[in-house]
């Protein structure tokens, strides 16, 4: 039976954790780091690179490197590489497969089950896309849980027995969430974590702060050189990396230098060099509008929960972007001067909470109950384009609601059920989740047929909808025709492709190892022959040298089987070197032993004739001692 893990599938970085002896442990990746960049690249040879190695080569491979794909989850966005269109689910699956491989190497056993986190404000299509990514990666997705909820789960387990109200402020690389949760513990140490309200912005994160710096640098270059870098992909990638680094440095310093050589060339051939100083004050001024966008979700959460700032007991910061001093100051201002809790690692706490939830679902931990909510209202379009809500936002999940509707026209044979998610009054202003048709309605005057529409939201926050004609008993379940929901056969195809790519990568790695071993063996054998030429017969030396050359020739090609065959033949021939050297050594040892025996016999004879000398010496010693 495989292990269960918790995965924080982030915009910028991802993290994986598991339970060891009931306690959550963050798993280090193959590079020895505790987080993995959510970057996927396709090398010119077709190899798929993931993580730090993909991030490092981004400048030289801009068009084939994908980052921040989380922002495209739940959309019909695709990227074409070598004639194949890749969906956000498939790109995300590559990140998950890397995390899975590294976890299996770390744990020494298969990883089969996972709890994967997503932003609290993700809609149904985005949640389904996240779940599909896990499936494509070969994982059984136990649950999709909200990132702030996972963070509160990790934080809450370390607290005492008192009931507390926690505000989680989660600003990541691409998304922003605010959640209010109540954590209660009974005398037996059983924790109940209940989400009271959640709000957010799925297009606000550290990437936007980076973009402000990039735009400023592009403007500075344009003013100084008259060169527009906004269309130069390689220059933009270099600026992106510099902007990210500058943002990080400004969290601990009041100014930073951005220096880059040969960014581009002017029309007259002058190289474009960049050497700018960015102060924290200037950075905060240029990003003040982004900071302002954090206020509305915060205020909405307090309003929805019906509480004041004074009712918040603790504030927990999640996501690397909360390290920015301006963000910390904003949180302090919004919460009436409360200092944020610093006891959790903002980069790891979400994965830790997901690992705890995986243990709860698998039965490894029985001391916690998690009650989450749906972040957005759900409803259908009714006459006049009105959004009729069946489930209000911040309703505890799982939940199920039904309502009876009727026809708008006489003898209407079918009804089109259009499902939406959002808070606006008119359906057109909300997010369409999908459409399905209930047909075969018996002829009747308008308003007579009774059509029961049922919304069912599971523990993952994923929506299932059905409609039933109460007169005929005819029922129809929702199949997504809008949004980005992938049909099962498409997911199955992607799973097979992902497995095939993994098999290709594994074979490529094995082939590289075979080649390296063969090169090393050829070098060592050649050196052995050269070092022992005087001890080897010409026949042996020539035979081995010929086999070394055959292996070297095979290594120039791509035929791995030919390399293996040549290496095997060289190994057989190389054994003759050992035989020759050992035979020569054996002869030398035998000659040495015979010489030693002769010397011993001669020594005995001479000792017999010199007895008086030896005796005299012994007597003299005795006399000295006396």
From Swiss-Prot:
The modification Phosphothreonine is found at residue 175. One of its GO terms (molecular function) is ATP binding. Residues 469-488, 498-517, 583-626 are annotated as: Disordered. The keyword ATP-binding applies. Residues 609-626 have a biased composition (Acidic residues). Disulfide bonds: none annotated. Residues 498-516 have a biased composition (Basic and acidic residues). InterPro entries: ATPase_NBD, Chaperone_DnaK, Heat_shock_70_CS, HSP70_C_sf, HSP70_peptide-bd_sf, Hsp_70_fam. Keywords: ATP-binding, Chaperone, Nucleotide-binding, Phosphoprotein, Stress response. PROSITE patterns: HSP70_1, HSP70_2, HSP70_3. Induction: By stress conditions e.g. heat shock. Pfam families: HSP70 (PF00012). Acts as a chaperone. NCBIfam families: PRK00290.1 (NF001413), prok_dnaK (TIGR02350). Belongs to the heat shock protein 70 family. This is Chaperone protein DnaK.
